[in-house]
């Protein structure tokens, strides 16, 4: 558009030199006319360079508009940890808690009893340095040392566990490449209970009396309790969804059909080893990958969608299913699995009639006969951010994480 506008503006200007040249030619000599033409040619050459610059300037915003422009998105990351109360102190930690409840002013012994915890995790796939958090846990207060500052948290004691929760806000630069990588990214939270991993500032930190007072932005017991109960409710909903999937998969294989499959002779299994081996390789690889995960299900939270069993599907098919915009690939995978199961059942029935059957006593005593297949749940919920899972965690939704610290014997 800028190029056409420039040509339209310069059309009258290109006519003006011609009229001036003719009038000047009548009154001057030929040499003066040649000098005048050379001067005009130089002026036109200098003007011809300007449209290129205008074209370049006009093309720059178009290229930036079509390119992958990053967007800064604030992300709130909330962590809730449950620490055991009676761990390694022979009941001293619990007795100090009861002592502080009765006499809050006597805090000299309470400040000396502290435990050290160091946490590291990679928030984004391309992070080179992990996010680090240091925790000093006292009987009635916890100090959380973040990169942005120090937070005071009042733990919520539930039985023999002390819950500590805090929030961190990260400004993430979101691009198309990051959205592609983050769908397959899993956050692994690593935790150490050693003093060597702590920074020098935290290692020699001494809790003062002011540490028990209410700080600005501190997490109180009621807030920690509300946050933990909310996370627990979300995790129970996720467990119920997986149980529904398992019940539906069991209904697809009723007990009557299972008994019929158990009565198949052992010779049938030997003659058909080549057929199920190829189809079961993908399911075995997928089950191994699920066992390596920390939780039994992988969930993407934000929109609640019905969960679907994908046992027997390869990892490439699952990735294609996640990246696809429609559900056509999902229906194709399910139809393919059903057709394979029906074809194998019909072939098995035909070959059973041709072969001799085993005695019932041998079939009941033989534990290697083919039984019902194990149905593994793979629940998918469309969202931008995946579930943030740790080493010891309960499945939950949103950007929340529940981690249980195991007790030592």
Curated annotation (Swiss-Prot):
Residues 36-50, 245-265, 282-294, 338-350 have a biased composition (Basic and acidic residues). Pfam families: DUF4550. InterPro entries: DUF4550 (IPR027876). Residues 36-67, 239-298, 338-373 are annotated as: Disordered. It comes from the Eukaryota. Residues 51-67 have a biased composition (Low complexity). Residues 268-281 have a biased composition (Polar residues). This is Uncharacterized protein CFAP92.
